[in-house]
């Protein structure tokens, strides 16, 4: 009976995801209903993980031709090096592989050096190419080399300085997290006649390297992984579910819908037009019956026979107890068993 501790708690069946004005960067996610107190517990934990623990990419150091340290000024460049560093920290980067990787930006004045002027390499992409880095006057020339790496959270500049750092290498603070802002609120919601359940609303903004919905999924997976060590027992399978499988007069695989068989469009449409919804419906048909279906030919027949054979099934089978009265409920219940 220990499983009642978690099985009888109410939980949301599906998340409601509302994209913002930029679906790649913004989303509002609503989870309801939750047991009283779980909204605050989950909201706070997910927010902390979103801001601190997701992998991302960032600039770790820069090297500017003719500059020895961050307190220098550059002839013909309106910003000093400290201002340039502040702007570089805001460059949003997506990098699929491992680092570090080096990129270069060159500019001749007059004009503004933008993040999009950085010459990317390999799988590196600049997500905010219109971000200004510095402004050059007439006749000024500038070359900056950027070192990019992957990591998580915030890393201070002193930790980004390699032991063999060359003269002129300027390490900078790195904010690897792809999540820029997270806020949440907990409100009352109802389930049936009970009014004191929690409704959790999360508002998430990313830098565009991942979607807000994916960021939340990764954060939830991290939390799940961290909690697994605290579970010191094997969860017994639900007795009712085991009994139901044993008493089912046919294989649960027959409850799978035929549109999940990855058939050709022609074959799938023929089955749909003949009101064949489940595999259990299909295997009871004979070859002759199938060939009577409009637009259904030998090619489609052979395709279906091949797919059924891969499942250990064939046309013309007898299925006792088919179709069950509650077929839709059974299909949903036994989905994980086929």
Swiss-Prot record:
Identify the stretch(es) annotated as Alpha C-terminal domain (alpha-CTD): 250-338
* One GO location term (cellular component): cytoplasm
Q: Keyword Transferase, does the record have it?
A: yes
Q: What is its EC number?
A: 2.7.7.6
Q: Quote the entry's note on domains.
A: The N-terminal domain is essential for RNAP assembly and basal transcription, whereas the C-terminal domain is involved in interaction with transcriptional regulators and with upstream promoter elements.
**Which SMART domains does its entry note?**
RPOLD
Q: Which domain of life is it from?
A: Bacteria
This chain's protein is named DNA-directed RNA polymerase subunit alpha
Which HAMAP family does the record cross-reference, listed alphabetically?
A: RNApol_bact_RpoA
Q: Name one GO biological process term.
A: DNA-templated transcription
Keyword terms, alphabetized: DNA-directed RNA polymerase, Nucleotidyltransferase, Transcription, Transferase
Q: Which reaction does it catalyse?
A: RNA(n) + a ribonucleoside 5'-triphosphate = RNA(n+1) + diphosphate
Q: Which NCBIfam families match?
A: PRK05182.1-2, PRK05182.2-5, rpoA
Alpha N-terminal domain (alpha-NTD): annotated segments: 1-234
Subunit record text: Homodimer. The RNAP catalytic core consists of 2 alpha, 1 beta, 1 beta' and 1 omega subunit. When a sigma factor is associated with the core the holoenzyme is formed, which can initiate transcription.
Family in the record:
Belongs to the RNA polymerase alpha chain family.
Query: Function, please?
Result: DNA-dependent RNA polymerase catalyzes the transcription of DNA into RNA using the four ribonucleoside triphosphates as substrates.
Instruction: Name the Pfam families on file.
Output: RNA_pol_A_bac, RNA_pol_A_CTD, RNA_pol_L
Instruction: List the GO molecular function terms.
Output: DNA binding; DNA-directed RNA polymerase activity; protein dimerization activity
């Amino acid at each position: 009976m220990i499983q009642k501790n978690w099985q009888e708690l109410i939980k949301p069946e599906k998340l409601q995801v509302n994209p913002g004005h930029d679906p790649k960067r913004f989303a509002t996610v609503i989870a309801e209903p939750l047991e009283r107190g779980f909204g605050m517990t989950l909201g706070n934990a997910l927010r902390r993980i979103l801001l601190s623990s997701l992998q991302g990419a960032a600039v770790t150091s820069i090297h500017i031709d003719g500059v020895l340290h961050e307190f220098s000024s550059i002839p013909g460049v309106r910003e000093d090096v400290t201002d340039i560093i502040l702007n570089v920290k805001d460059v949003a980067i997506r990098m699929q592989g491992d680092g570090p990787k080096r990129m270069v930006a060159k500019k001749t004045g007059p004009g503004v050096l933008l993040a999009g002027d950085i010459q990317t390499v390999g799988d590196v992409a600049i997500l905010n190419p219109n971000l200004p880095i510095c402004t050059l006057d007439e006749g000024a020339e500038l070359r900056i080399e950027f070192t990019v790496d992957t990591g998580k959270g915030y890393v201070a500049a002193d930790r980004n300085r390699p032991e063999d750092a060359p003269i002129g290498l300027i390490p900078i603070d790195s904010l690897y997290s792809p999540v820029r802002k997270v806020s949440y609120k907990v409100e009352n919601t109802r389930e049936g006649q009970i009014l004191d359940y929690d409704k959790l609303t999360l508002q998430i903004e990313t830098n565009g390297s991942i979607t807000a919905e994916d960021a939340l999924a990764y954060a939830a997976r991290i939390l799940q992984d961290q909690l697994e060590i605290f579970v010191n027992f094997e969860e017994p399978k639900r007795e009712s579910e085991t009994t139901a499988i044993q008493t089912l007069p046919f294989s649960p695989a027959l409850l799978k819908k035929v549109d999940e068989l990855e058939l050709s469009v022609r074959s799938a449409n023929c089955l749909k037009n003949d009101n064949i919804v489940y595999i259990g419906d299909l295997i009871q048909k004979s070859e002759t019956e199938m060939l009577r279906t409009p637009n259904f030919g030998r090619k489609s027949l052979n395709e279906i026979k091949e797919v059924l054979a891969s499942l250990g099934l064939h046309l013309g089978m007898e299925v006792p107890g088919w179709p069950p009265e509650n077929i839709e409920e059974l299909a949903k219940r036994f989905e994980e068993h086929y």
